[in-house]
């Protein structure tokens, strides 16, 4: 999915609001995903999945950190997330649909915390970005 210059600007603007909250927003995104889509929990049998869990916070921080990395390399998301793509495709074997579910939950978290920023246009840009990230993370499944 091709991001326009306007999309890139919108995404970068949203992430200026998110960067300082990586752990909290990431944990909230994961908790929301696990509750809304219970089958996603199967990839985390060793995690304490309760609200406020240190494991959820740590992994949430990694998730948002990867998104921040993608934003920082928005013109080469595939290069920025290549190792992460390998990990998810070859070692973890995460069902590709889960990236879409995670993206949806992340959008909800952004909307909750920054409703004035998430205009319809920005929402569309962020959705395109999250789809692009998902496409990169699933590219090596083929």
Swiss-Prot record:
InterPro entries: Globin, Globin-like_sf, Globin/Proto, Hemoglobin_a-typ, Hemoglobin_oxygen_transport, Hemoglobin_pi
GO molecular function, one term: peroxidase activity
GO BP annotations, alphabetical order: hydrogen peroxide catabolic process
Tissue expression notes: Red blood cells.
Binding site for O2: 59
Coiled coil: none
Binding sites annotated in the UniProt record for heme b: 88
Key words, A-Z: Heme, Iron, Metal-binding, Oxygen transport, Transport
Protein purpose: Involved in oxygen transport from the lung to the various peripheral tissues.
Similarity field: Belongs to the globin family.
Pfam family, one: Globin
Protein name as it appears in the record: Hemoglobin subunit alpha-A
Assembly: Heterotetramer of two alpha chains and two beta chains.
GO CC annotation: blood microparticle; haptoglobin-hemoglobin complex; hemoglobin complex
Domain spans labelled Globin: 2-142
């Amino acid at each position: 999915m091709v991001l326009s210059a306007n999309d890139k600007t919108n995404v970068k603007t949203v992430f200026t609001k998110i960067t300082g909250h990586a752990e909290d927003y990431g944990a909230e995104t994961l908790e929301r995903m696990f509750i809304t889509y219970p089958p996603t929990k199967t990839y985390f049998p060793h995690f304490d999945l309760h609200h406020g869990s240190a494991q959820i916070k740590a992994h949430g921080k990694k998730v948002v950190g990867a998104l921040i990395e993608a934003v920082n390399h928005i013109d080469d998301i595939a290069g920025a997330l290549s190792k992460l793509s390998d990990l998810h495709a070859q070692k973890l074997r995460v069902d590709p649909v889960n990236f879409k579910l995670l993206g949806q939950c992340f959008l909800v978290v952004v909307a909750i915390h920054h409703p004035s920023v998430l205009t319809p246009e920005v929402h569309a840009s962020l959705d395109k970005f999250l789809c692009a990230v998902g496409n990169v993370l699933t590219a090596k499944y083929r």
